[in-house]
């Protein structure tokens, strides 16, 4: 599982001209589900995302997590994160979970986030999405499990 997290001032996602998810200050997640991912992987990643300290405290040190600042989370499924880019000039998606399995795992991941934090907004699995964001920093991390 790979999750690219970005600290944002605000972010939104549009599908077919309609805004379907938006947050103010918080985290934008791009989530790639791989063949080897399990429920345990999802639980560990959800906990890590919510506890990851990327927001500044009063001394300017990245010492606060999204829950501590009352921020939002916008989660976007992105199978291209599971690409193998080691060889050639075209990515291979052999490590990505098959679509039906990936959707079930992604939905479970979102539900784990929702059980622990609010607000959680999402895009639409496998849709052509337009994601807008205002990076804060920029602060971006790739989390892998």
From Swiss-Prot:
GO cellular component, one term: cytoplasm
Motif extent (Gly-cisPro motif, important for rejection of L-amino acids): 137-138
Family: Belongs to the DTD family.
Domain notes: A Gly-cisPro motif from one monomer fits into the active site of the other monomer to allow specific chiral rejection of L-amino acids.
Superkingdom, taxonomy of origin: Bacteria
Recorded name of the encoding gene: dtd
InterPro entries (alphabetical): Daa-tRNA_deacyls_DTD, DTD-like_sf
Location of this chain's protein in the cell: Cytoplasm
EC id: 3.1.1.96
UniProt record, GO biological process: D-amino acid catabolic process
CDD domains: Dtyr_deacylase
EC category: hydrolase
UniProt keyword Cytoplasm present: yes
Assembly: Homodimer.
Protein name in UniProt: D-aminoacyl-tRNA deacylase
Record keyword Cytoplasm present: yes
Keywords: Cytoplasm, Hydrolase, RNA-binding, tRNA-binding
Stated role: An aminoacyl-tRNA editing enzyme that deacylates mischarged D-aminoacyl-tRNAs. Also deacylates mischarged glycyl-tRNA(Ala), protecting cells against glycine mischarging by AlaRS. Acts via tRNA-based rather than protein-based catalysis; rejects L-amino acids rather than detecting D-amino acids in the active site. By recycling D-aminoacyl-tRNA to D-amino acids and free tRNA molecules, this enzyme counteracts the toxicity associated with the formation of D-aminoacyl-tRNA entities in vivo and helps enforce protein L-homochirality.
Phylogenetic placement of the source organism: Bacteria, Pseudomonadati, Pseudomonadota, Gammaproteobacteria, Cellvibrionales
HAMAP family in the record: Deacylase_Dtd
One Pfam short name: Tyr_Deacylase
Catalysed transformations (reactions): glycyl-tRNA(Ala) + H2O = tRNA(Ala) + glycine + H(+); a D-aminoacyl-tRNA + H2O = a tRNA + a D-alpha-amino acid + H(+)
Main location: cytoplasm
Gene Ontology terms for molecular function: D-tyrosyl-tRNA(Tyr) deacylase activity; Gly-tRNA(Ala) deacylase activity; Ser(Gly)-tRNA(Ala) hydrolase activity; tRNA binding
Organism the protein comes from: Saccharophagus degradans (strain 2-40 / ATCC 43961 / DSM 17024)
């Amino acid at each position: 599982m790979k999750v690219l997290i970005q600290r944002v001032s605000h972010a939104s996602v549009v599908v077919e001209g309609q805004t379907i998810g938006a947050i103010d200050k918080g985290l934008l997640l791009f989530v790639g589900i791989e063949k080897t991912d399990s429920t345990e992987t999802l639980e560990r990643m959800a906990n890590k995302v919510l506890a990851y300290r990327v927001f500044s405290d009063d001394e300017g040190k990245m010492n606060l997590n999204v829950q501590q600042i009352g921020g939002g989370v916008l989660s976007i499924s992105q199978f291209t994160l599971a690409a193998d880019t080691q060889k050639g000039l075209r990515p291979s998606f052999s490590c990505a979970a098959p679509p039906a399995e990936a959707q079930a795992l992604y939905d479970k991941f979102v539900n784990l986030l929702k059980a622990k934090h609010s607000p959680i907004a999402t895009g639409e699995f496998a849709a052509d999405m337009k994601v807008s964001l205002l990076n804060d920093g920029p602060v971006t991390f790739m989390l892998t499990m």
